[in-house]
Amino acid sequence: MPRHSLRQIALFWSVNVARLVLAATFIFSGFVKAADPMGMFHKLSAYFAHWGYTFPLDSLILRGMVVCLAAVEFVLGLQFLLGMRMRLTAWCSTLFMTAMTLLTIYIYRYEPVPDCGCFGDAYVLSNGATLAKNVVLLLLCGLCLFAGRYTKRLISERNQWLTSIYTWVYVLGLCLYTLHYIPILEFTDYRNGTHWRDAWEGRFSAEAPESLSTLCFTDAQTGDDVTEQVLDSGYCFLLTMPEISTADAGNNDRINDIYDECVDNGYRFYLAVGEPWKKEDLQRWVDYTGAAYPVVSADAVQLKAMVRSNPGLLLLRDGIQIRKWSGNDLPILNDALAQQTYRNSLRGLIGLSDDNGDWRELPEKSRFFWKRPLGRLVLWYIIPLLVIMALDNLWVGSKYYRRYTQRRRLRRQQNAQATPAPEMDQQEEAPAEENQ
């Protein structure tokens, strides 16, 4: 086999393996950012705080940066996966990874944050591991840039725009949904079913992670430690406000209704504000909302991880996390019709049985992938994408079939014109014999 053939084969396999590695990395990185944008929001906020810039939790600028970052990474990953617009994709990814590599060099040298957050809270890498990863990815981007002609495209050039638009719509829709509500996928240690009290008491397990051992709730008025009361047996609603100065008070009526129901039924209800907090901010909230519930303070970083919302609502039973809600999705309890509906009643919210006071256990995780939140998110994207690719292959196949039939018809016509008819030859020979 000639040397150039071996070289081409080696380049083909090297470039396509690099393309798939880049695709997997960019898709995973963009997906986890889109599935939990507020997690990346807090990472970027920590970066800017190190450089002397502070952003409130309701900053649209920082949220826009997170959405753009997630969307760009996800779209680049898809373009690598399908081999679309490889030269443009390779150039964009090379510039992107160059900037990220320079940033991680700075992070590795000065350590402004404990981890870079490239994969959010889904998979935490050390700063050294992140730097090594980015260097490898930058080299792979360079390989795709200088030998991109050896990549194999999985969708026709004519229909690339449709796949790109669909991907942009999907990732932007996922970002906006999870920004408005809480993330569909929970990457933090504060997922439903977590045993807060066991972790606080030092009994660590898969359901009681060690990161919760530092939980501490302090009475805002007296300064006493009230963690024992918050994690005590029975039901406890925890209204989390990592940053009370920017907390959205649009749903204060729903919050007050839930508090009134808790008082009537003997359930605990606390407002947990992030430290440090100012008395004037708390007083402004009380004056505006008419809040009468007790206030405790806690670490703002932990409150941000509990619920990706400001405010957010948590429900604990015997120190076990049961449910959580975004401030934009709080239940309505003051409507007469809603009170008649079990799901919108307080009994339905806390998980009590409809006919008696027995506790309904949390539903077990389904063994079917498509019934899990991750499975539904993946299928919502994969199934339409496969339909688009199947229709594209049908279009390409029909085009080649038409060309094949046209060439076959033309070849038959050419053969018919080139081959003389036998009857005509005999008629030409007959007059020649008569003349002789």
Where would I find each of the regions flagged by the language model?
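Short, internal strand/loop/helix patches
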Residues: 287-310
